[in-house]
Every structure is written in C-alpha cells, then in structure tokens.
C-alpha cells in the first residue's frame, strides 16, 4: 500500500535539513579556528573532493571525513547498489535556480540533499590505485603553466627548499635536494605566485601557501606531512567564521588552479604518447 505524500511534512524535513546544514558549516568553521587537527581534516577532505565547494567540504569534514566516493541513492542504484539500513546520509548543499533580490543583486537558491559514501551502500569499496607518476614529471607539470619564473640557486635563506619572491615574480629552488623535497617546496611557494594579485606579502600568506602545498602533495601521492597543520597562527584563531571561510576559498582556488594546470600538461603529455604509439 502506497503512503500518502504529506507535503507539509516533507517541507518541514527540508527546512530542518537546511537549518542543520548551515549550523554545521558555522560550527565546523568555529572549531577549525581553534583546532589544528580539525583544520587538517578539512584539508584532507578538500584534497579528495576538489570539485566540492568550501561549504560542502566543511559538511563532509563534519559528518564523514573518511568518505571516498559520494553519491545520492539514485546514483548508487545506477551502479547496482543500495543504501544500507540505518544510514541517514550526509547533508550537502546544491545550487538551484538564480533569482533577483529586491536591491537588484543576483542570488542562487540553495537546496539541501543527502548523499552517501560507498561504505554506506551494499557495494564493496574499491581501493584507489596509488598515484604512480614520476615525481620529476609532476614537477614539470606543476611549473609548466606557472604565473612566474622558476630558477635554481645553490643556497637559499635559512636552508629553505624553495622561496617565492614577489618582487622578482620568481620561485627560487635550492639545488641538491630529492625530487620529493623539491616538490613539497615548490608546491608551497608556487601557491604564493597564484595568490599574488599585486602588492603581495609573502609573510602574510605563509600559512595559506602551506595549506595549498599540503593539498597538492595529497593529490599527487607525495608525503605532505611536513606541511600538515598542527596549530593555526594566532591571526586565524581570532577570525570570525565568515572571514576564515574566505581564506578557505583562497586556498581552494589556488590548489585547484595549480591542479588544473598540472592536468593540462599531463593530459597533453599522455595524448602525445598515445599518438606516437599509434604511429608505430
């Protein structure tokens, strides 16, 4: 026997989900402002789900940070799986139609939906293959479309692996390091170049660049523990959640720009290799 659809009850549940999602975002931001581990958890999630907005990465970090593959019930049914009994799902925000406010500005309706990790379904999670790209190739990909020059030096101040100079628009790299050390250093310092929009202070953005470097290491299979966040600088602990969120957007944007540029290089490289193989 089919249940009668109760529109009011449905609307009430949707409103409860909306309020819960927005409260969760605010609570997670507040926690991240004083908890280095919580901040690193967010970076871990953003590294896995690069297409997710800051708000949705915050929601995943708050509800199921170990998630690896997310989709709604219809998505999993399409794969031949079903949601396990008792699983309530993960609240995410989904942009809807745009609208015009009374003051003439544009806005976007936000819908709240529930998604599920593959571990919450009857399907068996498949272990993702480890990134096996050559580190030198990854480095070439990272600097190929960089908005700055890259130069090498025998020594850098304080023995740093790499150093971005806003004045010279150059990332200087210290010679004599392992490829992994160079990757970590360049990933962090290259972030400065992507963040630099003029009158740039490297010192004021060291923490943001560290976060970008950590995300890039995770995405490319490089050990990024030396760039992990254990404690936030004081200025971030004193920020209002809304301001901290803007910094998270800057981190996400820079990390995704570098990742996109790397993909462009690696995809062209792979495409060229396939063409040469076909010609043989």
Would you name each region that the model predicts?
Residues 1-280:
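N-terminal accessory/interface modules of nucleic-acid-binding and processing proteins
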């Amino acid at each position: 026997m089919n249940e009668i659809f109760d529109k009011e009850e449905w609307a009430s549940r949707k409103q409860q989900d909306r309020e819960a999602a927005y409260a969760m975002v605010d609570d997670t931001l507040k926690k991240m402002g004083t908890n280095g581990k919580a901040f690193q958890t967010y970076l871990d999630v953003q590294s896995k789900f690069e297409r997710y907005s800051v708000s949705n990465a915050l929601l995943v970090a708050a509800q199921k940070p170990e998630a690896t593959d997310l989709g709604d019930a219809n998505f999993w049914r399409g794969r031949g799986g079903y949601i396990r009994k008792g699983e309530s799902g993960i609240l995410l925000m989904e942009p809807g139609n745009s609208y015009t406010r009374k003051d003439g500005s544009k806005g976007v309706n936000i819908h709240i939906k529930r998604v599920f990790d593959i571990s919450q379904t009857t399907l068996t999670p498949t272990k993702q293959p480890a990134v096996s790209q050559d580190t030198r190739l990854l480095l070439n990909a990272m600097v190929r479309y960089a908005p700055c020059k890259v130069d090498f030096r025998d020594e850098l101040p304080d023995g740093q692996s790499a150093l971005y100079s806003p004045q010279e628009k150059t990332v200087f790299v210290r010679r004599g390091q392992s490829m992994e050390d160079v990757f970590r250093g360049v990933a962090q310092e290259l972030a400065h170049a992507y963040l630099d929009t003029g009158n740039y202070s490297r010192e004021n953005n060291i923490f943001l660049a560290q976060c970008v470097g950590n995300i890039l290491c995770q995405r490319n299979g490089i050990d990024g523990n030396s760039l992990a966040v254990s404690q936030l600088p004081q200025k971030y602990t004193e920020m209002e959640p809304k301001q901290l969120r803007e910094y998270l957007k800057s981190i996400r944007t820079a990390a995704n720009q570098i990742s996109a540029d790397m993909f462009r290089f690696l995809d062209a490289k792979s495409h060229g290799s396939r063409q040469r193989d076909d010609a043989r």
